[in-house]
Every structure is written in structure tokens, then in C-alpha cells.
């Protein structure tokens, strides 16, 4: 079943519902009503708005006023052809699907997005961890004689020792470092949470660089951001996600690491990976990462074990005749 979509005009276009002409539905009214109905954070609302505008622009440039399920499948294929990652494609399709679900529920329109799946996600992670050697080189490369170096060292050191997400570090305030039972804890607002009700433990090696940085900043007020901008325009303000990513990317590039798979988020992967290599149990690593599902943590363990116990080495040993390096061997080979 097809129907005339809202079009891409501020005045709106007539909408057909089961062959009957309904009232005009202006684009901005529909978008605003849909977005306001979503019980999500402001950043998610903005993502929904951008995603829908992208879809509606795609319809407009093709002169499509009667989209069908095939239209959405074609849109999905177009996203693939444009080289978007499976993660990005899925995000766009989820937004379109939510919008048509809402239109069905609130306007009685046929849901042409029902059953449309996102792109098949690759197994594993989209970012790689740093090696222990790279971590040491990265930290040693930072000149801490000036404030920028003190901040960047404290920040990167915090990431690789605690597994914080970038947004968690950005949201942190000076007052969020508190003592409990003789230990320093950093209370954080975790992913998808409204309060700072999770924490990471700050060892002496993690805490000392932070205090050195804060002292050099002039002992900021408790409610001040833990890590602040040093730009002329926004000096003292909270770092943005973009700025933080740029800082870390720049530090990585300074030691010759320039890969799309090694970014700010890699530091979180690094901490979780190092914890397992250091002997942490799966449950301990899950607590560090604050993974809701232990299966996510198991991916890290699987990757470590897969490399450590790689059967490719046994094949090499067999072909080269070094059978003494192989355990049980089938003598009929």
C-alpha cells in the first residue's frame, strides 16, 4: 500500500490514508511532534532530526511522493553504495523505522518500514586496542612542562587505566573525585544513564597526574569540569566530544599512529584488553568496562585467546617439520 509522504515543503502536502484525502501535515510539525515524543536525551533527538532530514532530502531529490517499502530498501542500498559503515546505515534505518512506527501509531498511516532491518553488523569491534608498548610510547611522548601536556597526559592516562568512555570523561567534574574506604573513586554518568551512579577506581598512578594538572589549572572550583578547554574562545569550558577526539588523535599521530581503527575509543578497548592480559577474570573486566551484557566482555577474551592459541602456528610447525612444537598430532597425515 502506498501513500503520499509529507514531502519536503514547509507547507506540507496532502496525505492519503487508504485512498482518502486527509488534512495537510506540515513537515516541521511532523518532525517536531515525532522528536518531542521520543523519551531520549537531547543529543539523540538531534540525531533523529538529522537522520530524518537526510531521508526526506533523498526522497525529494528523486521526486518520490509515494514511498513504499521498496523505497526504503532502495534508500538502504544507496547508503551502502555511498560507503557508509554498517553502524551508520543501521542508525539511519532505525530512525526511519521509528518515524514510520510513530506515524502508524499516531496518524493511522500504513507502516512501510515494518520489517526493514539495519545493515548486518560486523562481528567484533570497530576500533582496535593499543599494544602495551604503544601505550608506554604514547604517555612518554607527552611533554608535561606546560598545562596542555599535563592535561593530555592525565586524560590519556585515565583512559588507559580505567576504560572510561569519552563522554564519561567529558561529563566529569572536579567534585566527582571522592574518597571512600581509603580509595579515590571517580563517579561518572555512564552510557545511557541520568545520574552519576557508577565509578572507576583511581590508583595512585592515575590520580597523581590528575592532581598535578588541576594544581597547574589553579585549583578550579568543585563544580568545574575535570578536563577543560584551553582555546582562546572557550578557555575553561567543558571539552566537547570533537575536541577530545582531536586531542587524542593528534597525540597518536605524533608517535606515528594514524589509523581509522586507532582513535580515542581505542583507549577504552586498550584498558579492557590489558586488564584481561594482566589476569583479571571476565567478571572483573566486565565490572571495569561496565558492560550490561557479559557477552560483550567475552569478545575481548575471545580475541586474546584466539591470537594466543592461533592454530596457524601449528600449521606452520607441521609444514616446516617442527613437529616437536605441536601437541597431539594425527600420524595419518
What residue spans do the PLM features occupy?
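Conserved catalytic core of the tyrosine transesterase superfamily
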Residues: 2-333
Amino acid at each position: 500500500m502506498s501513500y503520499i509522504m509529507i514531502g519536503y515543503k514547509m507547507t506540507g502536502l496532502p496525505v492519503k490514508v487508504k485512498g482518502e484525502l486527509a488534512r495537510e501535515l506540515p513537515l516541521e510539525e511532523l518532525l517536531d511532534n515525532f522528536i518531542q515524543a521520543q523519551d531520549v536525551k537531547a543529543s539523540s533527538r538531534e540525531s533523529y532530526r538529522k537522520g530524518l532530514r537526510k531521508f526526506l532530502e533523498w526522497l525529494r531529490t528523486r521526486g518520490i511522493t509515494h514511498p513504499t517499502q521498496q523505497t526504503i530498501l532502495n534508500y538502504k542500498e544507496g547508503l551502502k553504495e555511498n560507503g557508509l559503515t554498517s553502524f551508520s546505515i543501521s542508525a539511519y534505518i532505525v530512525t526511519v523505522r521509528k518515524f514510520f512506527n510513530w506515524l502508524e501509531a499516531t496518524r493511522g498511516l500504513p507502516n512501510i518500514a515494518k520489517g526493514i532491518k539495519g545493515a548486518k553488523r560486523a562481528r567484533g569491534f570497530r576500533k582496535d586496542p593499543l599494544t602495551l608498548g604503544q601505550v608506554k610510547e604514547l604517555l612518554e611522548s607527552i611533554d608535561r612542562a606546560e598545562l596542555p601536556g599535563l592535561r593530555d597526559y592525565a586524560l590519556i592516562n585515565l583512559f588507559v587505566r580505567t576504560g572510561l568512555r569519552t563522554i564519561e570523561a567529558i561529563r566529569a567534574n572536579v567534585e566527582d573525585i571522592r574518597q571512600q574506604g581509603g580509595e579515590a573513586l571517580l563517579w561518572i554518568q555512564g552510557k545511557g544513564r541520568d545520574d552519576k551512579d557508577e565509578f572507576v577506581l583511581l590508583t595512585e598512578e592515575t590520580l597523581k597526574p590528575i592532581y598535578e594538572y588541576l594544581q597547574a589549572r589553579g585549583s578550579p572550583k568543585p563544580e568545574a569540569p575535570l578536563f577543560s578547554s584551553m582555546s582562546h574562545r572557550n578557555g575553561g569550558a567543558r571539552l566537547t566530544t570533537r575536541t577530545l577526539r582531536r586531542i587524542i588523535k593528534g597525540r597518536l599521530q605524533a608517535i606515528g599512529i594514524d589509523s581509522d581503527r586507532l582513535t580515542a575509543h581505542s583507549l577504552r578497548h586498550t584498558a579492557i584488553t590489558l586488564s584481561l592480559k594482566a589476569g583479571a577474570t571476565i567478571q572483573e573486566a566486565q565490572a571495569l568496562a561496565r558492560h550490561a551484557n557479559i557477552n560483550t566482555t567475552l569478545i575481548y577474551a575471545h580475541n586474546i585467546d584466539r591470537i594466543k592459541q592461533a592454530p596457524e602456528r601449528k600449521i606452520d610447525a607441521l609444514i616446516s617439520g617442527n613437529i616437536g612444537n605441536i601437541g597431539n598430532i594425527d600420524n595419518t597425515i
